[in-house]
Amino acid sequence: MERASIETAIKLIIAEIHNKLSEAARIAKAAEACVQNGAIAEGVEVAMDIEQPIYEAGRLQDAASLLGRMKRDQN
């Protein structure tokens, strides 16, 4: 893979990690609002939706790390 392609891919991956974590933060904020208003069960249910975007952000980070190593190995 060419160096420029790797750098472009890393930039896109990092942007997507930001999107996924922003989504998780929005979900957490909604869950917090629920529990602050006494809807504990609803807050827990809402918070369960955090798992997928965090999982996806983690896998994207794995990909970015791999591409970073590939880029370093090209030097």
Task: State each model region's role.
Residues 1-34, 62:
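N-terminal acidic leader/helix
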Residues 30-71:
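Short, charge-rich amphipathic interface segments used for partner binding and complex assembly
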